[in-house]
Design a protein with these regions (language model features):
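Short, polar/acidic, helix-capping and beta-turn segments at strand->helix junctions
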Residues: 1-90
Length: 90
């Protein structure tokens, strides 16, 4: 856990999500839904600028809410992605 500006925490969080996506053979283009929790909803515009650096094409559905986050973090993001070829048998 790293504490920084909302932009830094957003970029770090999405970088971690990107690594998990890559392990599943996915990219950010495969993300269909994100639920984003901000410690302070007043940070939304700055959060959104950093978020859009990762989602450059068609944006996934997104819910963003203010939440009480533990450990003094500013952002938490849950992402759901479709796995290419997932659910198909050979």
């Amino acid at each position: 856990m790293v504490h920084g500006t909302i932009e830094e925490e957003t970029r770090l969080t999405l970088s971690h999500i990107g690594k998990v996506l890559a392990q599943a053979g996915c990219t950010f283009e495969d993300v269909v839904k994100c639920t984003c929790h901000l410690a302070d909803i007043n940070d939304f515009e700055r959060f959104d600028q950093a978020y859009r650096e990762f989602f450059t094409g068609v944006k996934p559905a997104r819910t963003t809410v203010q939440s009480v986050l533990g450990g003094g973090i500013k952002v938490e993001i849950d992402a759901i992605a479709r796995v290419p070829g997932g659910g198909q048998s050979a």
